[in-house]
């Protein structure tokens, strides 16, 4: 879980899907839910819950100068550039993602759904596992 930077309950991170990360997600699947967010949800997450990592301290992303100072060498100068890099999984995705602090989300409004069972995967009416595009509804409830 620490390799995925998921150290607390209801934390969220972006991950580039590769063979190694898929294997890591398989190992922690009973404890996490994942899917493919839309650009609007990525933008909403960064604007509402986004914090940057500057000198190992958690800084809110209130000004583009914070991003330009940390990621200017990679061509990322504003919040929109950061969102674009995360959404497109560009060449500087790793640096942009490591700059972002893991998102601290709230517990979902109205719970995880009626009749959702903790010990079953999402495909079988549970909570954890791959939600694919339905992750967007959960993100909207947790922002």
Predicted features and spans:
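Core subunits and conserved enzymes of cellular information-processing
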Residues: 2-143
């Amino acid at each position: 879980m620490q390799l995925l930077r998921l150290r607390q309950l209801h934390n969220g991170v972006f991950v580039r899907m590769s063979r190694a990360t898929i294997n890591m997600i398989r190992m922690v699947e009973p404890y996490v839910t994942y899917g493919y967010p839309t650009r609007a949800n990525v933008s909403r997450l960064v604007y509402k819950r986004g914090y940057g990592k500057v000198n190992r301290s958690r800084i809110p992303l209130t000004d583009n100068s914070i991003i330009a100072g940390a990621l200017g060498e990679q061509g990322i100068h504003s919040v929109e550039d950061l969102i674009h890099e995360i959404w497109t999984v560009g060449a500087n995705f790793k640096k942009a993602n490591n700059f972002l602090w893991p998102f601290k989300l709230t517990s979902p409004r109205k719970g995880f759904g009626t009749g959702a069972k903790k010990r079953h995967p999402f495909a079988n009416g549970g909570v954890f596992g791959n939600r694919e595009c339905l992750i967007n509804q959960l993100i909207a409830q947790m922002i």
